[in-house]
Swiss-Prot record:
The lineage of its organism: Bacteria, Bacillati, Bacillota, Bacilli, Lactobacillales. This is V-type ATP synthase subunit D. Keywords: ATP synthesis, Hydrogen ion transport, Ion transport, Transport. The keyword Ion transport applies. HAMAP family: ATP_synth_D_arch.
Length: 203
């Protein structure tokens, strides 16, 4: 603890007591914020882990399926299947405030880009059709995964900042204020006793 460099006066004592009350209120609010952020963060981490495992599993299986599907077609035909994008994806990113943390909210609009796309169920095979269907179903999960991962990163940063502020109040500001208040109270009591002794001597 470090005693603040202030004059031991009653006015200063009152000011320090007000500062201590404010610091203690701020400490409680920040602790509550930190705890709620942690609760939400843990929930998001669980969702993130679940989504990541799910997406990775789908991608691994899909790559295997694609290798099989590709082996059943000649290379030129496979190139033709992928030569023109069949869909256009517009990505929209909005902002949402969660406990003073600005996090992204993503959604998309998918439209057919070319009705006469090279990809055709006639020129393809059932294996390749399954690959396309799986990849299309994965888009929403990939978007949600990106959203959750970014939110986790931003919330982790805010938790760390809040933790530092809580610790600063708990281990530095509040103890220093308390120590200084105690010191001033002792000094004022000493002054009162000294004054009382002088009065008694005069009498």
């Amino acid at each position: 603890m470090v005693r603040l460099n202030v004059k031991p006066t009653r006015m200063e004592l009152n000011n320090l007591k007000e500062r201590l009350k404010t610091a203690e209120r701020g400490h409680k609010l920040l602790k509550d914020k930190r705890d709620e952020l942690m609760r939400r963060f843990i929930s998001l981490i669980r969702e993130n882990n679940r989504l990541r495992k799910e997406v990775e599993s789908y991608l691994i299986d899909n790559l295997k399926s694609f290798a099989v599907a590709k082996s059943l077609k000649n290379s030129l035909m496979v190139e033709e299947l992928f030569s023109i994008p069949s869909k256009e994806i517009e990505l929209f990113i909005e902002k949402e405030n969660i406990m003073s943390v600005t996090v992204p909210r993503m959604h998309m609009n998918i439209t057919s880009q070319n009705e006469n796309s090279e990809y055709s169920y006639l020129s393809s095979n059932s294996e390749m059709d399954d690959v396309f269907a799986t990849m299309n179903s994965l888009i929403d999960k990939l978007l949600r995964l990106a959203e959750v991962e970014k939110t986790c990163q931003l919330m982790a940063d805010e938790i760390e900042k809040t933790r530092r502020r809580v610790n600063g109040l708990e281990y530095s500001i509040i103890p220093n204020l308390s120590e200084t208040i105690h010191y001033i109270e002792l000094k004022l009591e000493e002054a009162e006793r000294a004054n009382l002794v002088r009065i008694m001597k005069v009498k």
